[in-house]
Structures are given as C-alpha cells and as structure tokens.
C-alpha cells in the first residue's frame, strides 16, 4: 500500500449527549460528557491508518495538555508525526451535541489549527488529503506537494464555503455533501464523491451511485471523516475510485454504530467483514 499524507485539523472533541438537539435559547439536561481526540484531518488520518495505510500527518497543536493527549493518540495509531508542529495558540476544540437519533450540532474553536502551514513534499506519498479546517495556504500547499511528486490530490471541501471553488477544481478528487457541492457551483474537479448520508454516495458526474451499508446508527459525528479516510486508504492500495468508495462506505457504516470520531474508527478486519 502506498503512503497517505494528510494535512489537516486536530481537535479535542468535547461531546455532550442529549435526548434531542435544543431549540435556540433552550436549555436541556444531558446524559453524559465525553472528551475524545478529533479534528477532521486527524480523524481521517486515523481512519486510513486503521485500515492499514502508511499515514503521515501534517498539522499544528498547542503547547498544552490537550496537545499532549492528541499527539499521543495519533502516535498510538502508528501515524508518522514528523509534520506535526506546536505553537503558542491553544489546541483546537470542537464542542459537539449528539442526540439520541444520532444527529449532531458542532461548533469548532480552531485555535492552533489556524497556524497550520503548507506541508513539505513527500516522495513516497501516493495520495494527499486535506480539508477546509486549515488555512488556505495549507490547502494550496497540499495540492502543490501532490503535484510535485505526481501523487493524487484529494480535498474534503468541508465546512462548506471555506475554500475558493477554483482551488477545489484543481484537485483530482473532491469529497463533498449536498450543501458543499452547491457552494462549488460549476467549479468541480474531474471526480467528485458526493456523500448522501443514509442514501450512500455518488460519483459525479458520470460514476455510479453506491448505497450506504446497513448500520445501527447511534452517532453520525464521524461518518464523513470515516468515509474520507477509507476512500484514500483504498486509493493508496491502487483501487479504482468506485472500489475505494465502497471501502469508505463500509468504514462509515461501522463508525456510526459507535460513539465519537477517532475512537469509533474501525479496524481493517472489521471493515473486511462488513464487506464480505
């Protein structure tokens, strides 16, 4: 399997679990509070690593207790942290509410993620992956690093509207949901993976639609990151895009059956069993 390089965010997820999501101005009583490693970039890196990919991560943490915890978590999944920097800003935090039906609301406090820099090229990289939770220069630098060595360049253009559509169009593959693809308009890369939640995903413009795998959903927070990590792991194996997407969908179907993001990412034997 080829190497996957991920340039992205890393946060401490602070998740509160509630019966339902609150209305504006409403106070609800929650059932439990969980601290867990998160951040779109780190989540996707962990998802790929647990599927057997050789992963190198580029990001920035604060010089604080959360930073120590998150660095140790990434190292525990065998991820190369040679591109992980420290800065004086606090480590990023995501405040998450999760309802009993699995739906969620998320507020991200970027902190040190606003200091992520353009990554250095890696001659062994087969796939580069980035997202919209880091500065524009880091996203542009990820594309440049991929182009320098002929690697595939993949962008998860989330959250919506954070990246110029013209920049997204220069990547080989974009992973977007229905809101994010609307924000891009007609500026699309050659291949777009359109995620459709419980309906699965579709390869735009001319690829197949693939159904979601059956799952007992309890928390959808990490579903998109699981899909992205599974997808790039498949691409690093040399799979065609549709086959890589199937791997991503299987990864997501297992993730939503567990609480949290990184702790919920499945192993390769689990994903292979789901696909069998």
Identify the role of each PLM range.
Residues 1-4, 186-276:
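Conserved phosphate-binding/catalytic region of the ribokinase-like
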Residues 24-28, 32-35, 50-127, 272-276:
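Conserved N-terminal subdomain of the carbohydrate kinase-like
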Residues 49, 75, 144-148:
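Anion (oxyanion) recognition and catalysis
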Residues 126-191, 198-201:
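Conserved beta-alpha-beta core of the PfkB/ribokinase-like small-molecule kinase fold
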């Amino acid at each position: 399997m080829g190497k996957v390089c991920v340039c992205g965010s890393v946060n401490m997820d602070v998740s509160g679990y509630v019966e339902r999501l609150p209305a504006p101005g409403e106070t609800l009583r929650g059932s439990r509070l969980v601290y867990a490693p998160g951040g779109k970039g780190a989540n996707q890196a962990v998802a790929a690593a647990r599927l057997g990919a050789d992963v190198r991560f580029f990001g920035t943490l604060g010089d604080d207790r959360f930073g120590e915890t998150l660095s140790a978590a990434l190292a525990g999944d065998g991820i190369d942290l040679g591109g992980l920097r420290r800065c004086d800003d606090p480590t990023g935090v995501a405040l998450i509410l999760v309802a009993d039906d699995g739906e969620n609301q998320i507020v991200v406090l970027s902190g040190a993620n606003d200091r992520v820099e353009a990554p250095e090229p890696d001659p062994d990289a087969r796939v580069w992956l980035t997202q919209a939770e880091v500065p524009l220069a880091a996203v542009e630098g990820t594309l440049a690093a991929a182009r320098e060595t002929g690697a595939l360049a993949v962008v998860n253009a989330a959250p919506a509207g954070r990246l110029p559509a013209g920049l997204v169009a220069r990547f080989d593959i974009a992973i977007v949901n229905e809101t994010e693809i609307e924000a891009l308009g007609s500026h699309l890369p050659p291949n777009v993976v359109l995620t459709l939640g419980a309906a699965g995903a579709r390869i735009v413009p001319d690829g197949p639609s693939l159904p979601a795998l059956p799952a007992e959903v309890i928390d959808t927070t990490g579903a998109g990151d699981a899909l992205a990590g599974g997808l790039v792991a498949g691409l690093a194996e040399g799979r065609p895009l549709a086959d890589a997407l199937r791997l991503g969908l299987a990864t997501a179907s297992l993730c939503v059956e567990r609480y949290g993001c990184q702790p919920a990412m499945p192993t390769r034997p689990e994903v292979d069993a789901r696909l069998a």
